[in-house]
Design a protein with these regions (language model features):
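Acidic, proline/glycine-enriched N-terminal capping motif
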Residues: 8-15, 21
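Single conserved hydrophobic/aromatic residue that forms the stacking wall/gate
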Residues: 1-11, 305-313
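Conserved, structured C-terminal
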Residues: 29-306
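Short beta-strand and beta-hairpin "edge-sheet" elements
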Residues: 23-26
């Protein structure tokens, strides 16, 4: 929903492509005056973008490029990045979602202060990655030695705590932006001020839904919320959704992403519960804090859940 002509050079903003349902939640990077990259989540959006421009209404070329990302995340990420790229980029002054060009392992890269953790972190986009992946990768490992760098999959408890969604796990094209807490991305200002005049795919549907929500109607049944979950620490990613109910009755929703949070000393999760019409001060749908549910685990006893507001980073 981002108006791309407002993006600065070497800047980036999160956007969400949708047509009623969310097709993808990429980051849009403006590399130069007339060059934009979509850093995609777990769905193929290239053919969709080409389809939007099937009649050549926009004077653009849409194609997949030979670029691959690597993330450096965590409290030591700044120090590691300084060792990795030296003074090529003023990292201390780089804003969140800021972009810069740099060489890593002697290869051309784009650096973005962003990531999938909710913590301090950076993403390295390697150009011509099929040719130079080893050069970049080995340089990262070498710079990370003194920082005790670990090569791991995403730390899900971090992104769950920060309210960072995983497409295909927490939402997909069956969900609209409002019910998965992305409604703020639809408005121009991000503060609930719907003053965007430019057209975009799904605008009529979403603006109608916005009006229904503000009028106290419920255009959908389930709302994504943050949850705290009792019981033993969850040590493995859930292979399927866990159903939840009110007081052991028929299932009324489901958990999408559960994980143990070591600092909080409890299990946290995201899940869909019945939408009761509760809105934030900016007019966006949220869950009602303190509502209790039961989770139904396969071959295990049910466990109490306490719902709270989903923390949006």
């Amino acid at each position: 929903y981002t108006e791309v002509d407002t993006l600065s050079l070497h800047d980036a903003l999160p956007i969400c492509n949708q047509y009623g349902g969310v097709l993808n939640d990429p980051i849009l990077l403006r590399i130069s005056q007339d060059e934009f990259w979509f850093s995609l989540s777990d769905s193929d959006i290239g053919l969709y973008l080409q389809g939007v421009n099937h009649d050549n209404r926009f004077n653009v070329t849409i194609d997949e490029i030979d670029v691959s990302p690597v993330q450096i995340q965590g409290p030591k990420s700044l120090a590691l990045m300084k060792d990795l790229i030296g003074d090529q980029v003023e990292l201390d002054n780089m804003p969140f979602y800021g972009l810069a060009e740099a060489k890593v392992g002697g290869r051309d890269c784009v650096i973005s202060q962003s990531g999938f953790s909710g913590e301090a972190g950076y993403e390295i986009y390697l150009r011509d990655s099929t040719l130079y992946a080893d050069d970049m990768w080995n340089a990262v490992l070498e710079a990370g030695k003194k920082h005790n760098l670990m090569v791991i999959a995403p730390a899900h408890h971090r992104r769950i705590q920060a309210g960072i969604l995983s497409w295909g796990q927490d939402m997909d094209n069956q969900h609209n932006p409002f019910q998965c807490n992305l409604g703020y991305q639809v408005s121009l200002s991000g503060k609930g001020e719907w003053n965007k005049t430019a057209d975009y795919v799904g605008k009529e549907v979403l603006e109608k839904m916005r009006d229904q929500i503000r009028a106290g109607e419920k255009p959908y049944k389930l709302q994504l919320v943050g949850l705290s979950l009792g019981g033993k620490p969850i040590e493995e990613y859930a292979p399927d959704f866990w159903l939840i109910s009110e007081d052991g009755k028929e299932p009324c929703g489901f958990i999408t992403s559960p994980w143990y949070h070591p600092e909080q000393g409890r299990n946290i999760a995201m899940g869909y519960v019945p939408f009761d019409g509760t809105l934030s001060k900016n007019g966006f749908p949220i869950g009602k804090e303190g509502t209790k549910y039961k989770v139904h685990l396969p071959d295990r006893k049910s466990t109490r859940l306490n719902s709270s507001h989903l923390l949006i980073s």
